[in-house]
């Protein structure tokens, strides 16, 4: 019946919407449930206004401290974004088939919706159920990975029954927060990068019914739970052409089509992207225009994931690869997208966060910094500042929301090395000339002019100033007929930064790279003057008919030009533009210009408000200098400025601004106490033959649902026994005098394992960055007993489940074969892992992904409140020469002064630097670092407030698994440091007790 209805709908709806508009107009679409959110060929239309969706991604589950969400979101808003995107995480909320958790601590994500409303941003909500995200099994619940639910992401009824409770609950939670219900959730994504609508070549449109029926079921379920906002989808690349109603109106297609792109590769291992992008070339731009014209011509060109950075795989470069997508990348690629008529774009990632616990897929380690504009430690960087310049421009460039592409790759009039795309608003005639190098991979310094068509004719610009310059891997957007408030620019070769209306008068901000020249024409102006020259030169005012042509060169600083009609124009270089802010007085995501204030100088401006009588301008934000100049451009009624609640002394300038100075403590004098006072205990008693494993799970399955069958029996796949993350322990028994064992163990990239027979170490697979399986033939020597039961312990690491179809790839022992044995096989196996019943978290606050199965973890040695008074003193700097696991623990107080936001990172340094060991860092019960110096890539581990107590005691734990016996001494030096500090209105000191549940006697049963 379902199949019949599918084909019936397809026949009724037809196959493809015409790609060209009729009668010069494009149809305006909605989903039939609301007209609050509509769209057409040009852009989205929200509450009747055209809208450039400018968004960035963050994951609340990668920053599991709800008190920190406001900090990150304030920084997103301050950079000019009007939207942010979030994934949910199925496993984080659904630890077993019977349990859904949307209440405990960070599991309750509704605070994010409240903050979006308060700050004035829309939300692109992406609930999966599969999300990828370099997360363990792509965020599938790991109980789903046994094969018992089929191959996943299809119409298999077993899989449908698995996702339905989670999917329905999420939709019911989100429904009240939709724009249509007074909230700010704008769109709702169905699945993630599921480019499988078609079988074979997409142009043949042979339906893939399994995927189609899956998508239709997800859509119907969400609608049944009250989701009325538009559905969106994100095609994984340019090749799969899936889920656009323009390409095929039916077969599960969604309301708004999108396509993801990572032109500089999503990983620091650039070869992984060759099959998608071709061989890597730095700064090689990609054409999207033709794709969107073919696949979604009556919809806005939408990039739901556009590169904000890239993740760092195991063995990658220390600190990631920010050089692959630096500030210049943001400058060039985001502008180039505008030149291709993209009017909806979300950066992945804008804030990456941390793969704490066992959140990560095997492709990535603890850090998920992603070289993002907002770093893992929540601090902003040069890429953030460069992105902010673009975002502030988008906020005021209203004509961008409706443009036609007039020409592309047009050569600059004087330099064939520069080309530009011209896009023009058909209603206002406002145009944007997006300039780039003819070969974007070439970053030479080039001077050029362009032929610009304006409402007053064609001009070769600039007319009087020095030529336009592209210096490096950059782009510039040259505007013509640019309207702002009651004014307009006929053109400008200096880039537009922002626009504010104060006391019903316009203030325009322009910027240019340090030392370059710009030229602009103010329509209707008769005269102008330099009211303040902060680094300006070659300033000229030239009447041109009814208009005024202005030339200026700008070194480091900010200059203010005033005009006879009341217009003020701020011209600044890049360095000053980086510290130029446009806070908004309203919670309207459109950020109207008459609700903004210009502020220059601080490291960050978080908010702005007026006192009730309008005489005090109240600013909050961050600054990091002992003396930082601040200049604000408020209404005339303002006579006082406060910064973070404190009045600052200001003086008024002739051109209407107020200038003052911000002070901050001497932040470079901040210090942290030494991490010392370590105590230690053996964390691997399971290696001993006397250890009692009677409570462990019997690993006795003789068959498995997993499509990959083991080479020996019983089945020793960890997920089949209800354990899924971290370290697992297998104990196999046999009788007789075997001489050795062959082991084949799978644990994902960068995993490892070690083995002991009757308490004695026999060998390790130390691991490598890419292999996910390790094979060893281990000799027992004279350790096996022919007269008693022998016990083999295998301690296995598990770096996570693979993504997409690889989620079913098993983890565990594929083959355990005794060698030269009088017994043919092991007589029995037992297994244990994370404390709690299988598939059940003992710690619902930190959640199912927080800890693995080490003895120390099971017994809660990493938790606050555990009594270590009987332990002996020992330092991880000099560990035992025996292979095994030792747990180290200490308590260190912190006393960060109030009024400061401080980023703290732990440092782990091995001796020797490539030591064959594996260490886990725990902070107040949270695992915040996986350290494998043999494999490499990370020695600094940021830990945020809320995990760390900034004003109180901190329990720090370190498990050290030595994988080699004897030889040179080994150790791990544990330190910490302040990486950045600011005087801030954000207060990182708060009561985090609820996030840090302590030790309980319940743990003792897992000894």
Swiss-Prot record:
Residues annotated to bind substrate: 87, 132-134, 192, 262, 370
Catalytic residues, chain numbering: 193, 305
Signal peptide boundaries: 1-18
Annotated catalysed reactions = Hydrolysis of terminal non-reducing beta-D-galactose residues in beta-D-galactosides
Carbohydrate-modified residues are 20, 23, 155, 208, 269, 409, 453, 594, 624, 681, 703, 787, 815, 825, 878
Top EC category:
hydrolase
SMART domains from the xrefs? BetaGal_dom2 (SM01029)
| InterPro entries linked to this entry | Betagal_dom2 (IPR018954), Betagal_dom2_sf (IPR037110), BetaGal_dom3 (IPR025972), BetaGal_dom3_sf (IPR036833), BetaGal_jelly_roll_dom (IPR025300), Galactose-bd-like_sf (IPR008979), Gly_Hdrlase_35_cat (IPR031330), Glycoside_Hdrlase_35 (IPR001944)
Key word Plastid present: no
**Cellular component aspect of the GO annotation:** extracellular region
Q: What is its EC number?
A: 3.2.1.23
Instruction: Spell out the Pfam families in the cross-references.
Output: BetaGal_ABD2 (PF13364), BetaGal_dom2 (PF10435), BetaGal_dom3 (PF13363), Glyco_hydro_35 (PF01301)
Keywords per UniProt: Carbohydrate metabolism, Disulfide bond, Glycoprotein, Glycosidase, Hydrolase, Polysaccharide degradation, Secreted, Signal
UniProt-annotated location(s): Secreted
Coiled-coil stretches are: none
Show the disulfide pairing.
268-321
Record GO terms (molecular function): beta-galactosidase activity
Could you confirm whether the keyword Ribosomal protein appears in this record? Answer: no
Please provide the Gene Ontology terms (biological process) for this protein. polysaccharide catabolic process
- According to its UniProt record, which protein family does this protein belong to? Belongs to the glycosyl hydrolase 35 family.
Q: What's this protein's function?
A: Cleaves beta-linked terminal galactosyl residues from gangliosides, glycoproteins, and glycosaminoglycans.
Q: What is this protein called?
A: Probable beta-galactosidase B
**What organism is listed for this UniProt entry?**
Botryotinia fuckeliana (strain B05.10) (Noble rot fungus)
Task: Tell me the name of the encoding gene.
Answer: lacB
């Amino acid at each position: 019946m379902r199949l019949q209805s599918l084909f019936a709908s397809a026949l009724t709806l037809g196959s493809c919407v015409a790609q060209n508009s009729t009668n010069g107009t494009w149809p305006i679409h909605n989903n039939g449930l609301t007209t609050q959110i509509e769209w057409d060929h040009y852009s989205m239309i929200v509450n009747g206004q055209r809208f450039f969706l400018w968004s960035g991604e963050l994951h609340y589950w990668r920053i599991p401290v709800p008190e920190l969400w406001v900090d990150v979101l304030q920084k997103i808003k301050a950079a000019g974004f009007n939207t942010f995107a979030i994934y949910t995480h199925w496993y984080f909320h659904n630890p077993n088939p019977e349990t859904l958790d949307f209440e405990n601590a960070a599991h309750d994500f509704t605070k994010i919706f409240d903050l979006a409303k308060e700050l004035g941003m829309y939300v692109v909500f992406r609930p999966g159920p599969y999300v990828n995200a370099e997360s363990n099994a792509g965020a599938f619940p790991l109980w789903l990975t046994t094969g018992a639910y089929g191959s996943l992401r299809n119409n298999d009824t077993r899989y449908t029954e698995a996702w339905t409770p989670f999917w329905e609950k999420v939709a019911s939670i989100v429904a009240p927060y939709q724009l249509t219900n007074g909230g700010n959730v704008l769109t709702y994504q169905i699945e993630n990068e599921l480019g499988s609508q078609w079988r074979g070549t997409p142009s043949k449109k042979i339906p893939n019914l399994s995927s189609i029926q899956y998508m239709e079921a997800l859509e119907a379920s969400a609608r049944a739970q009250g989701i009325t906002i538009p559905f969106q989808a994100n095609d994984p690349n340019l090749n799969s052409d899936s889920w656009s109603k323009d390409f095929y109106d039916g077969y599960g297609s969604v309301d708004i089509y999108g396509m993801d792109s990572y032109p500089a590769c999503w990983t620091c291992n650039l070869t992984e992207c060759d099959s998608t992008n071709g061989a890597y070339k730095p700064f090689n731009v990609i054409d999207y225009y033709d794709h969107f014209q073919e696949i979604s011509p009556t919809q806005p060109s939408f990039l739901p994931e556009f590169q904000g950075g890239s993740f760092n795989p195991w063995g990658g470069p220390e600190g990631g690869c920010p050089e692959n997508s630096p500030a210049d990348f943001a400058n060039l690629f985001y502008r180039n997208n505008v030149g291709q008529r993209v009017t909806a774009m979300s950066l992945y990632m804008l804030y990456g966060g941390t793969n704490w616990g066992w959140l990560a897929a095997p492709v990535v380690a603890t850090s998920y910094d992603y070289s993002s504009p907002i770093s893992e430690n929540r601090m902003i960087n040069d890429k953030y500042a460069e992105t902010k310049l673009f975002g502030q421009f988008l906020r005021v460039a209203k004509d961008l929301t409706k443009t036609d592409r007039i020409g592309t790759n047009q050569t600059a009039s004087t330099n064939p090395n520069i080309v530009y795309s011209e896009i023009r608003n058909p209603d206002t005639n406002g145009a944007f000339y997006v300039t780039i190098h003819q070969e974007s991979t070439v970053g030479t310094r080039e001077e050029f002019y362009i032929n610009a068509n304006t409402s007053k004719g064609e001009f070769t610009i600039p007319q009087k100033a020095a030529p336009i310059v592209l210096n490096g891997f950059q782009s510039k957007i040259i505007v013509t007929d640019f309207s702002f408030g009651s004014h307009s620019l006929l053109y400008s070769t200096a880039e537009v930064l922002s626009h504010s209306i104060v006391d019903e008068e316009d203030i325009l901000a322009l910027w240019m790279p340090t030392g370059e020249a710009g030229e602009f024409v103010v329509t209707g102006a008769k005269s102008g003057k330099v009211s303040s020259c902060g680094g300006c030169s070659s300033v000229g005012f030239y009447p041109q008919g009814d208009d005024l042509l202005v030339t200026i060169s700008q070194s480091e600083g900010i200059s203010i030009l005033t005009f006879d009609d009341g217009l003020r124009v701020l011209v600044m270089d890049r360095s000053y533009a980086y510290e130029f802010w446009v806070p908004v007085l309203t919670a309207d995501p459109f950020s109207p210009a008459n609700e903004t204030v210009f502020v220059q100088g601080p490291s960050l401006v978080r908010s702005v408000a007026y006192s009730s009588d309008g005489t005090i301008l109240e600013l909050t934000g961050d600054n990091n200098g002992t003396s930082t100049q601040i200049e604000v451009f408020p209404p005339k009624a303002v006579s006082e400025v406060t910064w973070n609640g404190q009045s600052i002394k200001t003086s008024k300038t002739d051109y209407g601004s107020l200038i003052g100075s911000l002070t901050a403590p001497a932040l470079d004098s901040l210090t942290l106490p030494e991490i010392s006072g370590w105590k230690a205990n053996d964390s691997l008693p399971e290696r001993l033959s006397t250890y009692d494993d009677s409570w462990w799970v019997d690993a006795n399955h003789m068959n498995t649902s997993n499509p990959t069958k083991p080479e020996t029996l019983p089945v020793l796949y960890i997920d089949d026994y209800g354990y899924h993350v971290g370290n697992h322990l297998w104990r196999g028994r046999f009788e007789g005098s075997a001489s050795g064992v062959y082991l084949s163990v799978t644990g994902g990239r960068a995993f490892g394992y070690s083995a002991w027979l009757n308490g004695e170490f026999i060998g390790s697979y130390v691991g490598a960055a890419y292999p996910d399986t390790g094979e060893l033939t281990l000799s027992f020597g004279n350790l096996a007993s022919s007269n008693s039961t022998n016990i083999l312990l295998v301690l296995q690491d598990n770096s996570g489940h693979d993504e997409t179809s690889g989620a079913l790839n098993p983890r565990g022992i594929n083959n355990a074969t005794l060698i030269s044995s009088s017994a043919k096989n092991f007589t029995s196996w037992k297994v244990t892992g994370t404390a709690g019943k299988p598939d059940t978290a003992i710690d619902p606050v930190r959640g199912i992904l927080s800890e693995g199965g080490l003895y120390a973890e099971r017994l809660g040695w990493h938790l606050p409140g555990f009594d270590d008074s009987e332990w002996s003193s020992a330092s991880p700097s000099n560990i035992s020469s025996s292979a095994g696991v030792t747990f180290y623990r200490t308590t260190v107080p912190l006393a960060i002064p109030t009024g400061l936001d401080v980023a703290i990172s732990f440092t782990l340094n091995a001796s020797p630097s490539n030591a064959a060991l594996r260490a886990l860092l725990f902070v107040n019960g949270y695992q915040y670092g996986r350290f494998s110096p043999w494999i490499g890539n990370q020695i600094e581990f940021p830990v945020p407030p809320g995990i760390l107590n900034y004003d109180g005691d901190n329990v720090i734990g370190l498990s050290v698994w030595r994988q080699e016996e004897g030889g040179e001494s080994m150790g791990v030096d544990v330190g910490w440091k302040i990486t950045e500090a600011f005087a801030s209105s954000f207060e990182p000191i708060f009561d985090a007790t609820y996030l840090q549940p302590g030790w309980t006697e319940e743990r003792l049963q897992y000894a």
